[in-house]
Amino acid sequence: MSKTIYYACKYAPLELFAGYGATFSALDPLAESFSCAERCAHANLCGYAKAVLEQVEQSGIRALVLTNCCDAMLRVYDVLAASGKMEFLQLLPVPHQSTPATRARFARDLRRLADALQRYTGQEFDAQRAHAFFVH
C-alpha cells in the first residue's frame, strides 16, 4: 500500500507536504459509475464529490487531504472518516475572508496539518525541501 498523500483541491498546501518529505498526488476523479458513492453517501451529492469517493475506494487510497471549498467536500470527509479505512485523512478549512481572526485560525489549522504530516511521514519539516518545491 502506497504512502502517497492525495489531495482534491488546488488550495492544498503542497509546499507543506514537500517539507515533510511526503509523496503526494492530485486526485483525477473520473468515474464510470457511482456505485460505491451511492451506497455510502446521499444520492444528491454532486458528481465531483461522488467521483472523489469512487476514486478513493476503487484505487485503495488511504491518505487524503481535503479542503472545505464546498459543502460536498465536507460530506466526502464525513463519509471517509466514518468508513474507518483511511490511514491519514485531514480536512483543511480554507478561509473565505482575510481578517486577523481568520488568519490566526488558518495558522492554527496549518499547524494541526503540519503536526499530522509529521506523525504520518515520521519526518521533521525541512524548509529547503519546501522551498525547492515552491520554486520548481
PLM feature segments, named:
Residues 1-136:
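An N-terminal assembly and electron-transfer interface module characteristic of large anaerobic redox
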